[in-house]
């Protein structure tokens, strides 16, 4: 007798081994039809999986996150099937699930075209409509290698040949197409109804630039048509908001080939940067942080002690001088430990909070670089708190409250919280981990935050809280973090004198709110579609005259506003006022002041707010009051 335990606590008993599909049918015809896969004892499996002993089972449908992954994985195989039908000489390589979709890499004698993409998508729909069963078979490694060699799939044969000889491999077949895959997959192609091929790109085989350039086809797949339409609409909106386009259009910054992964900041863009930095400096000052500055380049010996040389060397920029090896810092923490350890510390000094606007460099692969979102040189609002285990809770509560306020001020009110707990390989005692994890969770409970637990996703040196922002068009951005570290202070010799006069090692909390300034400013630009709020806008007000007769008064108004601390541009060009208004509106300025004879004679200004909102005529003092209130409110 086999007992199958279901998520609602009920049980089903069977005399003989039973498949996931059979259990679903036993529960109800509707569930049997909706079943895409199953989760047996925590593992996602095909509906054909045979349950041979007492097990926990949940049936996965398109309402589950795992169901969407199965749909996307199976759609990647459907894409490969369609390509092989249309282009029999193409060779298939790999096709994983990615965020919001999938891709598949192909080797083919000529580049695919946009017209090919349309034909492939049409063929995919035809194959899905056939509702062909998707079946799984397991073969010894060497048999699988020979099979793929026999059908001319050299890349698949190479992948399988790299697997240990004593391991079996699983293959999935739908119609005439067979692919190597761990699975699971949908039971038949008819389950794949909503998909779209998105774009073509190049990708090196195995990610190595010495290998052949393959052709990558990206696609998206969803459970429901409405979900796909919403996603495509979001992509259209994201395209309009792309910080790379807006950076050029608004004269904020640019990129060029001579500096991959680095940014050329223009005066307006650097003004935005300075506003962000000045704001974060006040955050440091108001919350008990001491600002520090550590060297950007450090000797190899320090990186060896910290563990970075062993675990992170390929991502570090290195150099040599006078027979010594150095590296540009990829992160700020070792430098902060040096500052802490430079003096004899007492328990009375703890918690000791350091903050730095630290410039870091990481040798990211060129193919992964993306505007300001993925760069090689960046500045972090990096802070480290040295404390005792008993102080972790209070520090995390204070940090979460601070982070929430900062995000609100920048226009982000939707924050997702995640606690990443201990991995299998870790340093530190179980008791210390218990205490740290409990403190992180309790800090979110005390802060009134809803959160999820991610078991095993902490770093080897400690658990962490991740703070993810949801932007104006629904995209998620992981930004802030607070990370407990049991390892680095000990590795780098940080100690303090405890109350009992013994020397102890402090706990180190790594924390960042914005993360990378570059990435965060890119997010700000996209979240606000370039229309930055008044307090952040590089130019807050443009003063325009209608004719030369008002030029002196316009200059006087502008000078008055500048003295009050506002960033003002005066446009006295001999152009039509409608042209000047339109030009400054395109630059997304918060306010435009128009001055004609009436305004000059009355000592007033005509004010337009962004979005062509006419606020009418008012005295300059009233405008200043309005502007100050708006800056103060960070609206």
Swiss-Prot record:
Where Zn(2+) binds, per the record, is at 333, 384, 510
Tell me the Gene Ontology biological-process terms attached to this UniProt entry. Answer: threonyl-tRNA aminoacylation
Q: Name one GO cellular component term.
A: cytoplasm
Tell me its cofactors.
Zn(2+)
Q: What is its EC number?
A: 6.1.1.3
Catalytic: region residues: 242-533
Please list the residue ranges annotated as the TGS domain: 1-61
Catalysed reaction equations from the record: tRNA(Thr) + L-threonine + ATP = L-threonyl-tRNA(Thr) + AMP + diphosphate + H(+)
Q: Name one GO molecular function term.
A: metal ion binding
UniProt KW keywords? Aminoacyl-tRNA synthetase, ATP-binding, Cytoplasm, Ligase, Metal-binding, Nucleotide-binding, Protein biosynthesis, RNA-binding, tRNA-binding, Zinc
Location within or outside the cell: Cytoplasm
Q: How is the cofactor bound?
A: Binds 1 zinc ion per subunit.
Name of the top EC class for this enzyme: ligase
What InterPro entries does the record tag this protein with? aa-tRNA-synt_IIb, aa-tRNA-synth_II, aa-tRNA-synth_II/BPL/LPL, Anticodon-bd, Anticodon-bd_dom_sf, Beta-grasp_dom_sf, TGS, TGS-like
Query: Sorted alphabetically, which NCBIfam families does this protein's record hold?
Result: thrS
Query: What does the annotation say about its assembly with partners?
Result: Homodimer.
Q: Would you identify the family this protein belongs to, as annotated?
A: Belongs to the class-II aminoacyl-tRNA synthetase family.
Give the function comment from the record: Catalyzes the attachment of threonine to tRNA(Thr) in a two-step reaction: L-threonine is first activated by ATP to form Thr-AMP and then transferred to the acceptor end of tRNA(Thr). Also edits incorrectly charged L-seryl-tRNA(Thr).
Q: What is this protein called?
A: Threonine--tRNA ligase
User: Organism source for this protein?
Assistant: Herminiimonas arsenicoxydans
